[in-house]
From Swiss-Prot:
<feature type="region of interest" description="Disordered">
    <location>
        <begin position="61"/>
        <end position="87"/>
    </location>
</feature>
<dbReference type="GO" id="GO:0005525">
    <property type="term" value="F:GTP binding"/>
</dbReference>
<dbReference type="GO" id="GO:0042254">
    <property type="term" value="P:ribosome biogenesis"/>
</dbReference>
<dbReference type="InterPro" id="IPR027417">
    <property type="entry name" value="P-loop_NTPase"/>
</dbReference>
<dbReference type="InterPro" id="IPR015349">
    <property type="entry name" value="OCT_dom"/>
</dbReference>
<protein>
    <recommendedName>
        <fullName>GTPase Obg</fullName>
        <ecNumber>3.6.5.-</ecNumber>
    </recommendedName>
</protein>
<keyword id="KW-0460">Magnesium</keyword>
<dbReference type="InterPro" id="IPR006073">
    <property type="entry name" value="GTP-bd"/>
</dbReference>
<dbReference type="InterPro" id="IPR031167">
    <property type="entry name" value="G_OBG"/>
</dbReference>
<feature type="compositionally biased region" description="Basic and acidic residues">
    <location>
        <begin position="440"/>
        <end position="453"/>
    </location>
</feature>
<comment type="subunit">
    <text>Monomer.</text>
</comment>
<feature type="binding site">
    <location>
        <position position="173"/>
    </location>
    <ligand>
        <name>Mg(2+)</name>
    </ligand>
</feature>
<feature type="domain" description="OBG-type G">
    <location>
        <begin position="160"/>
        <end position="331"/>
    </location>
</feature>
<feature type="binding site">
    <location>
        <begin position="312"/>
        <end position="314"/>
    </location>
    <ligand>
        <name>GTP</name>
    </ligand>
</feature>
<dbReference type="InterPro" id="IPR014100">
    <property type="entry name" value="GTP-bd_Obg/CgtA"/>
</dbReference>
<feature type="binding site">
    <location>
        <begin position="283"/>
        <end position="286"/>
    </location>
    <ligand>
        <name>GTP</name>
    </ligand>
</feature>
<feature type="binding site">
    <location>
        <position position="193"/>
    </location>
    <ligand>
        <name>Mg(2+)</name>
    </ligand>
</feature>
């Protein structure tokens, strides 16, 4: 059963915003108490967060569809709906997030680093929030916006200081097992290591991580063997260690040719690996022929500029010198890195109030309107409510959409689409028509709020009659 997965395709969906509520305050002796509909709740976000305890993407391999909860709708009594709960997805340190086209969206390195993969939709406004001095009793509310949906690719690149590279069965897993407390699978056959293994090494006051990468063979950079699949784990390492087998039983191999082949594969792969500090480890010197071969090839390797160490992972020979030499290289690599300054957090809200829009006449005679505001307003409109449709028409008119349509040559009855081709609202354009004006006048205005109430008028009439009667009584003069 697979226990390590370093590349998955994930489908994330944020929660939709809750709909606003259209209601009227009801109380005894107050038949027209005014609008009191609450706003809808915000939809939950989908957030990827680095968790140091997570080492694989296996969970997302089995469950690739993840979604956050929707916001709750608003209620009467000015009660807003509850926000949807954010969905937090833990990922390993070193996870790279890409879109399906291969563009890098985020590179998550460091515990707690996060990325919002899908943003929740905003909740719709209730009619209480839509009320104004001119629009005292809106009979509608705005709908919640749908949440984002995105297909992303998660790719894990191991974060380690040192990478052990070499042919299969060169002894990389044995070496990492004796240098650290890691317990990789070790066996006497090629490709025993199928997944990268990480270990922590302490050398004096220096602590560093070391990665055992699955064996490479000729053509690994073109996809042969397992190398191409795992070469990405070498990209983040500061130091490369060539582990060469001095006791191989294959007649056509020797440490120098193995080194040349692995170097060629690293060069072909790219990723800036050519500039990494390198070290050569001649392993298995506990074997008599291995010791002789190591002493034979060492001068040639040193002539190329490599630091060479003769070790035996099985017999624990030369390990202390190797660990301290690696610590020295890691320390130099860390010192050479630019000092990380504290990140200045700048909050830049999403520009959802961009007033810009375009009107384009398409070949089929349809006028298409594109813009942040018009498209957002369309998503928030309940087209089953005539008053809401009229409110949308008023907003588009004030924004200048009608004027631009006229400039583009639109006439009454022409088709107008607002939004992209795959999700647009299409209607026949009627300029300067105020939908529902014959009933309500200004959009959302209720004349009943301005007219005298019958009960109050009767009370005033009765009071006037009593005042007149009292005045007549006071003015009465007996005979």
């Amino acid at each position: 059963m697979t226990t390590f997965v370093d590349r998955v395709e994930l489908h994330v969906a944020a929660g939709s915003g809750g709909h606003g509520c259209a209601s009227v305050h009801r109380e005894k002796f107050k038949p027209l108490g005014g609008p009191d509909g609450g706003n809808g709740g915000r939809g939950g976000d989908v957030i990827l967060v680095v968790d140091q305890s997570v080492t694989t993407l296996l969970d997302y391999h089995h469950k690739p569809h993840r979604s956050a909860t929707n916001g709750k709708p608003g209620e009467g009594g000015n009660r807003s709906g509850k926000d949807g709960q954010d969905l937090i997805l833990p990922v390993p340190d070193g996870t790279v997030i890409q879109d399906k086209a291969g563009n890098v969206l985020a590179d998550l390195v460091g515990h707690g680093t996060s990325y919002v993969a899908a943003q929740g939709g905003r909740g719709g406004l209730g009619n209480a929030a839509l009320a104004s001095a001119r629009r005292k009793a809106p009979g509608f509310a705005l709908l919640g916006e749908p949440g984002d949906f995105q297909d992303i690719v998660l790719e894990l690149k191991t974060v380690a200081d040192v990478a052990l590279v070499g042919y299969p069965s060169a002894g990389k897993s044995s070496l990492i097992s004796v240098l650290s407390a890691a317990k990789p699978k070790i066996a006497d056959y090629p490709f025993t290591t199928l997944v990268p293994n990480l270990g922590v090494v302490t050398a004096g006051s220096t602590v560093y991580t070391i990665a055992d990468v699955p064996g490479l063979i000729p053509g690994a950079s073109q996809g042969k063997g397992l190398g191409l699949e795992f070469l990405r784990h070498v990209e983040r390492c500061s130091v490369l260690v060539h582990v060469l087998d001095t006791a191989t039983l294959e007649s056509d191999r020797d440490p120098v040719s193995d080194l040349d082949i692995i170097e060629e594969e690293l060069t072909q792969y790219g990723g800036g690996l050519n500039n990494r500090p390198r070290m050569v480890v001649l392993n298995k010197i506990d074997v008599p022929d291995g010791k002789d071969l190591a002493e034979m090839v060492r001068p040639e390797l040193e002539a190329r500029g490599y630091r060479v160490f003769e070790v035996s992972a099985v017999a624990h020979m030369g390990l202390k010198e190797l660990s301290f030499a690696l610590a020295e290289l890691v320390g130099a690599a860390r010192a050479a890195k630019p000092k990380e300054e504290a990140t200045r957090i700048v909050i830049r809200p999403k520009a959802v109030d961009d007033a810009g829009f375009t009107v384009v006449l398409e070949e089929d005679g349809l006028y298409r309107v594109r813009g942040e505001k018009p498209e957002r307003w369309v998503r928030q409109t309940d087209f089953n409510n005539d008053e809401a449709v009229g409110y949308l028409a008023d907003r588009l008119n004030r924004l200048g959409v009608e004027t631009e349509l006229m400039k583009a040559g639109a006439r009454a009855g022409d088709g107008v689409a607002i939004g992209p081709e795959d999700n647009a609202v299409v209607f026949d354009w009627e300029p300067t028509v105020m939908a529902g004006a014959e009933m309500l006048g200004r959009r959302g205005e209720d004349h009943r709020l301005d007219e005298p109430r019958p009960a109050a008028q009767r009370r005033r009439d009765k009071q006037a009659e009593r005042d007149d009667a009292e005045k007549e009584y006071d003015d009465f003069e007996p005979f």
